Amino acid sequence: MSPTLAELSEAELLKRLARFAPPDQLSDDTAALPSDRRPLLINTDVIVDGIHFSDATTTPTDVGWRAVAANLSDLAASGAVEIEGITVALVAPGRTSWDWVDGVYQGISAALGQYGGILLGGDCSKGEQRLLSITALGRLGPLRLHRNAARPGDVLVTS
């Protein structure tokens, strides 16, 4: 019998999905595409109601901010020095108020205003559960950082 997703770790899930991509393509949170300019880094993260946020703990504005911050943090950790922009996929039940959606996009806009980049586009769909999937695009600086390249003795800096 096939295991359920609840029974698999994230690492095991990525290992199983890796057969669908070029070697080492899924070994990091970002992908790098060659370009005439600096390579383009691409990252996607999903946040889901009831798992990553809830009305009891998170305002709509904070939901939008958090979604952008998660993506831009991954880009920065991979060596991005310039944010091109993001796309947003929003899924929400029909009962979701416009005020909630407006607040989410206000948070998205505020985060982009502080860290750079623009809203490039996206998609909206009706669904049973609210979620945001953001894809962020940034330009690589002089140093491409890979989480799987860390070695004992390397310096780790957080802020």
Map each language-model feature to its residues.
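Glycine-rich anion/phosphate-binding loops
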Residues: 24, 56-72, 95-106
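Extreme N-terminal cap/leader segments of soluble proteins
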Residues: 1-59, 88, 107-112, 116, ...
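Glycine-rich anion-binding loops of enzyme active sites
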Residues: 37, 82-159
